[in-house]
Amino acid sequence: MGKSLLAAYGLWALGGPLGLYHIYLGRDSHALLWMLTLGGFGMGWMWDFWKIPIHVYKYNRQERKNIEVKEGEPPASPIRFIGQVATGIYFGIVAAIGLSFLSSFHMVVLPLAVALGVHLVATVGEQTSDLKNTLIAAFLTSPIFYGRAVSMIPISLTASITSQKHMRYRLQQEKQEKLSLRLYRIGLVYLAFTGPLAYSALLNTSLTVSYVAGSIGSMLEWLSIFPSISALVERLLLLPYRVWAVFSGGGVFRDHYFKEWEKIYEFVATFQSEKEEMACKVLGVNFKSTMEEINRKYRELVKIWHPDHNRHRLEEAQEHFLEIQAAYETLMRLRKSKTL
């Protein structure tokens, strides 16, 4: 029986982040990915708005048995690669929250979780990859970064690159199974993913919060070499807390359990405060300085330390000039984010 485009859009609107429309269209891998990442971190769900007509067309064409199996190597997809890296890191963080107490965590659990996240993205749609090679890449990379809080980043990058090299079209189209069996299978995987996470978050809250805060700190420090990406990550991390603040009238978590998790958002806010303090020190201003004062001080320092005005000490001038530029951009970005 053919699928309705209107019904697909209805499910996209009602249960998009949970992948209901992908279940409706028989795309179980895609649905599972959306369930575990809340719609591909929200961005994938929004992107699917333009992709739904194509998915419906492909399903109905397959129903009419008028579909041919593609051969050869699929073209490289930057979007799929980015999704693999992000999902691999996400799976690694979830594993760290729920299973870091295991003695074999860094050597077995972490690379396994990251590789499975990478492979899940690889199996979306009519393509797939070689799970064996993806696992090998993850397990070979893991010992190099043993015990480091950001180890899931290089593991995910290596596994994603390996997965991309072994991408291929499926040899045959998946057979349509009963909905109950498909939901049962998806449910088991979902419980296996969320079970350890829920256990750790509820029964070992303080330790979990401490680990997450440490991992976030290491990640933000590593990303600080890319100011734009670092700022975007900080905003995304603070977004849930700010949304809560709007609906709760102040953002105060009254329950003890939620107060523990509030520490993570306080940690990110503190990280931003430290960056603002360092930027103020470079420009010779303070937290209470107005935008006009900051702009005036910036122009003065740029004029003093511009390399064209300091040919006799060019290297020192270039170093100070770049430092002033970075401090000014940081202050502008943080001040703008506070006004939003």
Swiss-Prot record:
Domain of life per record:
Eukaryota
What does the UniProt keyword field contain? Answer: Chaperone, Membrane, Transmembrane, Transmembrane helix
Q: Which residues form the J domain?
A: 278-340
Cellular component terms (Gene Ontology): membrane
Enumerate the transmembrane spans.
Answer: 5-25, 30-50, 81-101, 105-125, 135-155, 186-206, 212-232
Q: What is this protein called?
A: DnaJ homolog subfamily C member 22
Q: Which species does the entry assign this protein to? A: Xenopus tropicalis
Q: Does the keyword Nucleotidyltransferase apply?
A: no
Instruction: Specify the protein's topology with respect to the membrane.
Output: Multi-pass membrane protein
Q: What does it do?
A: May function as a co-chaperone.
